C-alpha cells in the first residue's frame, strides 16, 4: 500500500464513522470532530475516543479509556496488531462503554 492509498482508506474510515454518528439516535449525546488526521469522538460524560493515522506505518491508532490499539489493513479489514480483533469491534466496545448504551458503527 502506498501513502495515497492509505489516506484514501483512512478517509473512508473517518467518513463512515462520521456518517454513523450523524445518524445516531440514542439517548447519549455523542459528537465527532475531525481535525487534520485526527478524529475525536466526545461523549456526554466528558470522555473521548481518539482515532488517528500513523502514515509512516500505514496504521490507524485508536485511543480509548480501555487502552490504545494499533491497526493494520489485512484484506479489507483493519485488524489490531496485538489482539487480532477488528477495528469496528473494538470501537463499538469502547463507544458502548463510554456512552453507557449500545453504539453500533455497522
Swiss-Prot record:
Task: Quote the SMART domains the UniProt record gives.
Answer: Frataxin_Cyay
Q: Which GO terms describe its biological process?
A: iron-sulfur cluster assembly
Q: Name one GO cellular component term.
A: cytosol
**Top-level taxon of the source organism:** Bacteria
> Annotated Gene Ontology MF terms?
ferric iron binding; ferrous iron binding
Entry's SUPFAM superfamilies? Frataxin/Nqo15-like (SSF55387)
Any single Pfam family the record assigns to this protein: Frataxin_Cyay
The answer on whether this UniProt entry bears the keyword DNA damage reads no
Sorted UniProt keywords: Iron, Metal-binding
Query: What Gene3D superfamilies does its record include?
Result: Frataxin/CyaY
**CDD domains assigned:** Frataxin
Q: What function is annotated for this protein?
A: Involved in iron-sulfur (Fe-S) cluster assembly. May act as a regulator of Fe-S biogenesis.
The record's comment on protein family reads: Belongs to the frataxin family.
Specify the protein name: Iron-sulfur cluster assembly protein CyaY
Source organism (scientific name): Salmonella heidelberg (strain SL476)
Per the UniProt record, the lineage of the source organism begins with:
Bacteria, Pseudomonadati, Pseudomonadota, Gammaproteobacteria, Enterobacterales
Amino acid at each position: 500500500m502506498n501513502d495515497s492509498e492509505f489516506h484514501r482508506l483512512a478517509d473512508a474510515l473517518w467518513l463512515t464513522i462520521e456518517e454513523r454518528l450523524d445518524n445516531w439516535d440514542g439517548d447519549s449525546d455523542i459528537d465527532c470532530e475531525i481535525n487534520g488526521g485526527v478524529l475525536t469522538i466526545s461523549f456526554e460524560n466528558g470522555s473521548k475516543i481518539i482515532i488517528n493515522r500513523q502514515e509512516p506505518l500505514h496504521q490507524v491508532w485508536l485511543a480509548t479509556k480501555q487502552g490504545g490499539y494499533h491497526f493494520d489493513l489485512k484484506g479489507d479489514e483493519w485488524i489490531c496488531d496485538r489482539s487480532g480483533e477488528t477495528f469496528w469491534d473494538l470501537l463499538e466496545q469502547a463507544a458502548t462503554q463510554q456512552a453507557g448504551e449500545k453504539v453500533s458503527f455497522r
